[in-house]
Amino acid sequence: MIFKYIQEPVLGSLFRSRDSLIYLNRSIDQMGWRLPPRTKPYWWLYYIWTLVVIVLVFIFIPYGLIMTGIKEFKNFTTTDLFTYVQVPVNTNASIMKGIIVLFMRRRFSRAQKMMDAMDIRCTKMEEKVQVHRAAALCNRVVVIYHCIYFGYLSMALTGALVIGKTPFCLYNPLVNPDDHFYLATAIESVTMAGIILANLILDVYPIIYVVVLRIHMELLSERIKTLRTDVEKGDDQHYAELVECVKDHKLIVEYGNTLRPMISATMFIQLLSVGLLLGLAAVSMQFYNTVMERVVSGVYTIAILSQTFPFCYVCEQLSSDCESLTNTLFHSKWIGAERRYRTTMLYFIHNVQQSILFTAGGIFPICLNTNIKMAKFAFSVVTIVNEMDLAEKLRRE
């Protein structure tokens, strides 16, 4: 079953936290970013595939964009110009993020081991069902992103075929689009599909890993609510349960710290580029004459918003979860407990008050407010274009 990992929970086949990465890992495998051990048969084929992807995505596309600017810039129409300007911004941002993730990819395996450790504490059926639903949600997110991103590629390809121009104005030294239009369009679409898939992976992975973090925060909060509620248990058992909760929180914090450097670097690049991309997309709408061009631009705008808004929303929810966990811990039944329990509880409360936050480049917090501020830059781009009367000048030319 293709969509097995987005199904509702069924007893006997519940997902683990690690299963939230199934569809993401398949995409990573397609990009050649998970090299198999050399003990596996035909490992060298995958290494060749990885090399091909690196050459196409990280070498051919930047080269093609540079050569397009050098050779074809004087022949650009206004529509071609704004199509061309948007592609290098998004592509170069994706390449920089991809390089960062490739150098830090070992953090993924460490985080997945921590997922398994957190799952060990999920002994109740209710907890396992919640983990299953979180994993299914993460896989649904990957499917939705595929629909948005490759929907844009399909629309761009359709528009190119209707208009009679290659979709991304990418220079190809081997095939002349004027002589072999369909072949050039096919090559350009396949290579851009690689950068789009890379973009998808880089935009989705923070959402999935933080959603898993959130679900284990919620499960920890539920365990804290049950502390010292069973009158049949003795002080030693109550204390042991509290210690386990402290260990759970420590593991969750360590999980967040493992991912923070990678998320911080990639989101810094993304948040800086999203405002410029939205501004260029808004300006380009003024020059598109056909309905197809405007539809493609609209789908592209949705894809740009998908790069930052969902993760900023998840981080906003994570901040609320941290506050809720602090309140839950403070209002648990610890008053009247033995001294060692109260001492450990005070230590726990102090640590829990330090929220698990993600920042972009260690400069500004990743939240909805930051996303809105970066998106406002789009209005600045439009304002500059309008004040310079650039639209009318380009139309006259």
UniProtKB/Swiss-Prot annotation:
Transmembrane helix in keyword set: yes
Annotated tissue distribution: Expressed in olfactory sensory neurons in the antenna.
InterPro entries, per database record: 7tm6_olfct_rcpt
GO terms under cellular component: dendrite membrane; plasma membrane
Pfam family, one: 7tm_6
Gene Ontology MF annotations: ionotropic olfactory receptor activity; odorant binding; olfactory receptor activity
GO BP terms: detection of chemical stimulus involved in sensory perception of smell; signal transduction
Cytoplasmic side: 1-46, 105-142, 214-262, 316-347
Highest rank taxon of the organism: Eukaryota
Subcellular location, record wording: Cell membrane
Membrane topology: Multi-pass membrane protein
Protein name (Swiss-Prot/TrEMBL): Odorant receptor 85a
Source organism of this protein record: Drosophila melanogaster
